[in-house]
Amino acid sequence: MHFYIGTLLAIALFKINKLIYYHYEVSHCSGKGDKMKTFNIASIPGDGIGKETVSAGRQVLNTVCDVHDGLRMEYLDLDWSCEYYLKNGRMMPEDGLEVLRSCDAIFLGAVGFPGVPDHVSLWGLLLPIRRTFRQYINLRPVKLLPGVITPLANRKPEDIDFLVVRENNEGEYSNMGGRLYQGTDQEIVVQNTVFTRYGVERVIRYAFDLAVKTGRQQVTSATKSNGINFTMPFWDEVFAEVGKTYPAITRNQYHIDALCARFVTHPQDFDVVVGSNLFGDILTDLGPAIAGSIGIAPSANIDPTKEYPSMFEPVHGSAPDIAGKGIANPMGQIWCGAMMLDHLGFADCGELVMQALTETLAAGMTTADVGGRSNTREVTEAVCSRIRMLAGTVA
């Protein structure tokens, strides 16, 4: 009952804030004296190191707000997690999606906890958010940053710098299928893949638009039409149709197995890569691995229309084995904050965070997972300090 009343009050306050600030224009990080813009952010630390990384990410975002008098963030703290599931039998309350609907964005840490199967957190929290709010784009940058060591030999930062666009709402992860004759030697299991023309076309078009927006020259499609004889040929057809409307952008296509190999052997060949839900999932983990560490990789679940809140989460898991030790790498979460700022219309502020993050890494201020000796707090404070210096205000 107390939670329900609190939820109603939170929603009311959020809506009041939106009415107050609706008429304000979005300013830029380089401009002082602009009118204030307030964003309401749902903060979901989740499990394990998520509590530490979200705290670090918020510290960096608050520093950006401190140096920019036209930007403010207010947080709605939500304890939804696998631990919440163990206590309540569900990953979030019944009205959880309505709570999130009132927010401008969702800042998520990591979910996962011993004793709770991964499919529980996926289907109980992440997928309902992605699908209810039409976050049909999962965007993950793959970039080798200065100071980070790649497992690939003789590769420099300019060799690994591309974007992976994953279809996030349908495809192979559709909840359709079933099992018959369970436990017998005649058991039958069927998992259906669902592609729609609308869904495939919009994600591919997003990839081409992204190439144009970021000044990249080519879009590469992940397929497997030599073995999957209905959905993948359809995907290829739509890719070709959409691609023809972007004559200045080169189209490439690889089967997923060959594409994975090429990520390793020729990462410099890619600008924007687009794939279905499953293939994109595979590539968006492989990409950060070749860039040095999943621990610094960000992820954005985006509704490009901005009708609904988008969700920003690092690629890394909850890492319960190091939770609470203060050694978690906060860079992935901080990078997520930069992507969130860009999505909310403060691209200059996102670039400021990325410059501070990059300079911090280049200076060797890193955690042990990428070869450093610093802890979570030290890395976070170093990024915040650089933001202040870059913005011309030393605290």
Locations of regions flagged by a protein language model:
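A structured beta-alpha segment of the ubiquitous adenosine-cofactor-binding alpha/beta core
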Residues: 85-98, 251-270
